[in-house]
Amino acid sequence: MELSSGVCPATRLQEAEKAAVHKRSPKVLEALRKLNIQADQAPVIAVLGSGGGLRAHIACLGVLSELKELGLLDAVTYLAGVSGSTWALSSLYTKNGNMEGIEEELKHRYEKNEWDFHESLEKAIQASKRENYSLTDFWAYLIVSRQIRELQDSNLSSLKKQVEEGVLPYPIFAAIDEDLLADWRERKTQNSWFEFTPHHAGYPALGAYVPITEFGSRFENGKLVKSEPERDLTFLRGLWGSAFADIKEIKNYILNYFRNPFGKLKFIEGPVTYSEAPRMNVDAMLLDLVMAYFTDMNDPSIKDKLCALQQALGTETDEFGIEMAEIIQNWNETSAEKKEQFLDHLLDRFKKTQEDTTTYSLMNWNTGLVWDRCVFVNETRKCVSKWQWGTVYNFLYKHGKIADETMCSRELLHLVDAGFAINTPYPLVLPPVRETHLILSFDFSAGDPLETIRATADYCQRHEIPFPEVSEDQLKEWAKAPASCYVLRGETGPVVMHFTLFNKDNCGDDIETWRKKYGTVKLSDSYTPDLVRDLLRVSKENVKKNKINILSEMRKVAGNPGNIPRVNKEACLGDRVKDPQGSQTVEFKKSHNISKD
């Protein structure tokens, strides 16, 4: 069976996207007519939302709500987001575009301070059993779900219907290939960017895509050899929104889940019936040991915990017991590598015990919840040690028709927050294949709200992509007291309207006060209902105050959508992988021997 998407030349849209955009066009024309704008051909208007954590999530919801209220959202063809804005965009689609309902639900969550820790923990525990478990899973289910107070079980592919019918704009969610970040920093390589839509996932600059339902499955030489279930939106939100802070800050954030005594109780409590054996509860002891080792491998109490565990197991006379006694005796002199090997060995031993109930009968091992939590803590510990994020199978692995060795030699990809590159998804709507005429870019970044313009201008200059010219002096001057909107236009390429969140128009002289009030790493627990309402209000004001400007630019591109000169598509796709056989489409095919979990 031939898959609907594969590695395709990037000089054309994927067929499903092309059909959805075509279906959207009459809806756009109808919306423009309601706005008293006449057009024979629907211009392509894209709305972009930047990263910025929970601040971006709430502010982007405010922007979408006001765009819809003013009748502007119906004239939009593409919605694209980075990091926190992807959370808002995904909410729009899961709620069928009902912005009033989304807004009321958002306020309710923060008024009631709702978040189900146990459900989130169970999701993370189940994810830790996957071969490709990474910190993205932990982050998604225990951090992001807490931030936005929502677990979303639905899949990205489930959002196709309203997109295919043209009811809502076509969504694009941005990520970055972490393994290519060094190339990005040095050369701003195009193939660093990765995108997700309800139909596909892949590298737009390479023209390499896989159906979204097969994202995360194992491919080899273009054939699907092991199918994996489609990941839910909670996981994807964690992948799209993982650039909250620097490494040290994130690491401490994760470790605090296990250091906090209350957190430990949360992990151990639940419907667990501990053994009434004369020896101690081995299951709880092992979990306590793993958590102690995770938070501080040099903790002096670890040796005592090992001694107690050894006594409870009663393994002093067998081979493993002798090994255990030896490592306990020399624990303080043992290398970190050997300590880790022993801990893995210990857990493997316990796993075998579950399978052989005649072994160590005194353990009365609880084979369910506590064991799962031990595995979860230990797998998370390994990921922290290796700092592994966004691990998924590479659908280009060993593909015979891919010339780029870097892209086809890796069995695994590591996808992370696109904010590590540019905090707004300009690179995903600027390629000429999407023929964007007008971009409404809403910036919710911390710090300089013009930095994304600066970074995008540099990126476009390197790759001969049309983008309005901006001078560094001008950007610096604007950043001192940002206006709510800047209109940028060049001789070629789309018109860009860049909106700043906190500006002199809605904050007066208190811009810095507002920025401090809504820090990127600010936890949702510190967001009061008033803070949520205020952020929604100022983000809406930016749209409302600039309605006339937006309509003016819409009118201009609608009057002459062909005014954007054609550019050399090959030049704009300089990093695109070339098929060594020529211009033919490289396809994926399902193997006759597909394994399923």
Curated annotation (Swiss-Prot):
The free-text tissue note of the record is: Highly expressed in ovary, where it localizes to oocytes in preantral and antral stage follicles (at protein level). Not detected in other tissues tested.
Region: Disordered; residue ranges are 576-597
Question: Record's PROSITE patterns?
Answer: PLA2C
Q: Which GO terms describe its biological process?
A: glycerophospholipid catabolic process; lipid droplet formation; phosphatidylcholine acyl-chain remodeling; phosphatidylethanolamine acyl-chain remodeling; platelet activating factor biosynthetic process
The UniProt entry lists the main location of this chain as nucleus
Reactions catalysed, as given in the entry: a 1,2-diacyl-sn-glycero-3-phosphocholine + H2O = a 1-acyl-sn-glycero-3-phosphocholine + a fatty acid + H(+); a 1-O-alkyl-2-acyl-sn-glycero-3-phosphocholine + H2O = a 1-O-alkyl-sn-glycero-3-phosphocholine + a fatty acid + H(+); 1,2-dihexadecanoyl-sn-glycero-3-phosphocholine + H2O = 1-hexadecanoyl-sn-glycero-3-phosphocholine + hexadecanoate + H(+); 1-hexadecanoyl-2-(9Z-octadecenoyl)-sn-glycero-3-phosphocholine + H2O = 1-hexadecanoyl-sn-glycero-3-phosphocholine + (9Z)-octadecenoate + H(+)
Q: Which GO terms describe its cellular component?
A: cell cortex; endoplasmic reticulum membrane; lipid droplet; mitochondrial membrane; nuclear envelope; nucleoplasm; spindle
The record's listing under SUPFAM superfamilies reads: FabD/lysophospholipase-like
Q: Where is the composition biased (Basic and acidic residues)?
A: 587-597
* Localization per record: Nucleus, Nucleoplasm; Nucleus envelope; Cytoplasm, Cell cortex; Cytoplasm, Cytoskeleton, Spindle
GO molecular function terms noted in the UniProt entry:
calcium-independent phospholipase A2 activity; lysophospholipase activity; O-acyltransferase activity
Functionally, this protein is described as follows: Calcium-independent phospholipase, lysophospholipase and O-acyltransferase involved in phospholipid remodeling. Preferentially hydrolyzes the ester bond of the fatty acyl group attached at sn-2 position of phospholipids with choline and ethanolamine head groups, producing lysophospholipids that are used in deacylation-reacylation cycles. Transfers the sn-1 fatty acyl from one lysophospholipid molecule to the sn-2 position of another lysophospholipid to form diacyl, alkylacyl and alkenylacyl glycerophospholipids.
Q: What is this protein called?
A: Cytosolic phospholipase A2 gamma
Q: Which source organism?
A: Mus musculus (Mouse)
